[in-house]
């Protein structure tokens, strides 16, 4: 028979021994050392080193500020995103599931104006040829 309301004790915490073992999370204290684990910074991929290398090829004695580098990095990301989006649309129009160099080339011609598109296509073709010959 269940105990009466007056006989019931208030709810207490369960004994420690009966608890399920807890998983250790990053940032919590470890049992052995008592120190917190260091959290690693989230890596941000940028084109800064590549932009800097090109700058030094063109103008060896010229530097660049962090703000200018940030602007150029945003510019490169924007152009890549536009080219990728356009190439994706072209592949979808042609009912293909793979973006090839042809779609990239066509999207560059559509996005970049006149002479800039011609130079970009020729440099891209040169880079693909160089890569293809080095992997053989």
UniProtKB/Swiss-Prot annotation:
Organism: Rosellinia necatrix
Annotated Basic and acidic residues bias: 1-10
Placement of covalent cross-link Glycyl lysine isopeptide (Lys-Gly) (interchain with G-Cter in SUMO): 8-9, 23-24
Chain's role: Core component of nucleosome. Nucleosomes wrap and compact DNA into chromatin, limiting DNA accessibility to the cellular machineries which require DNA as a template. Histones thereby play a central role in transcription regulation, DNA repair, DNA replication and chromosomal stability. DNA accessibility is regulated via a complex set of post-translational modifications of histones, also called histone code, and nucleosome remodeling.
Superkingdom of the organism of origin: Eukaryota
Quaternary assembly: The nucleosome is a histone octamer containing two molecules each of H2A, H2B, H3 and H4 assembled in one H3-H4 heterotetramer and two H2A-H2B heterodimers. The octamer wraps approximately 147 bp of DNA.
Name used for this protein in its record: Histone H2B
Family, similarity comment: Belongs to the histone H2B family.
Localization (cell): Nucleus; Chromosome
Mod. after translation: Monoubiquitinated to form H2BK123ub1. H2BK123ub1 gives a specific tag for epigenetic transcriptional activation and is also prerequisite for H3K4me and H3K79me formation. H2BK123ub1 also modulates the formation of double-strand breaks during meiosis and is a prerequisite for DNA-damage checkpoint activation. Acetylated by GCN5 to form H2BK11ac and H2BK16ac. H2BK16ac can also be formed by ESA1. Acetylation of N-terminal lysines and particularly formation of H2BK11acK16ac has a positive effect on transcription.
UniProtKB keywords: Acetylation, Chromosome, DNA-binding, Isopeptide bond, Nucleosome core, Nucleus, Ubl conjugation
Principal location listed in the UniProt entry: nucleus
GO CC, any one term: nucleus
Residues with N6-acetyllysine modification: 8-9, 13, 23
The keyword Nucleus appears for this protein: yes
Cross-linked sites for Glycyl lysine isopeptide (Lys-Gly) (interchain with G-Cter in ubiquitin): 130
Keyword Ubl conjugation (UniProt): yes
Single GO MF descriptor: protein heterodimerization activity
Region Disordered, annotated ranges: 1-44
């Amino acid at each position: 028979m269940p105990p009466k309301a007056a006989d019931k004790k208030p709810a207490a915490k369960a004994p420690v021994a009966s608890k399920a073992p807890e998983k250790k999370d990053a940032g919590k204290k470890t049992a052995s050392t008592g120190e917190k684990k260091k959290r690693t910074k989230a890596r941000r991929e940028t084109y800064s080193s590549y932009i800097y290398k090109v700058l030094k090829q063109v103008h060896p004695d010229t530097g660049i500020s962090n703000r200018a580098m940030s602007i150029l990095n945003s510019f490169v990301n924007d152009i890549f995103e536009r080219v990728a989006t356009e190439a994706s649309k072209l592949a979808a129009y042609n009912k293909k599931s793979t973006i090839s160099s042809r779609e990239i080339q066509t999207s560059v011609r559509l996005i970049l104006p006149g002479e800039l598109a011609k130079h970009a296509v020729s440099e891209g073709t040169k880079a693909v040829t160089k890569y293809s010959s080095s992997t053989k």
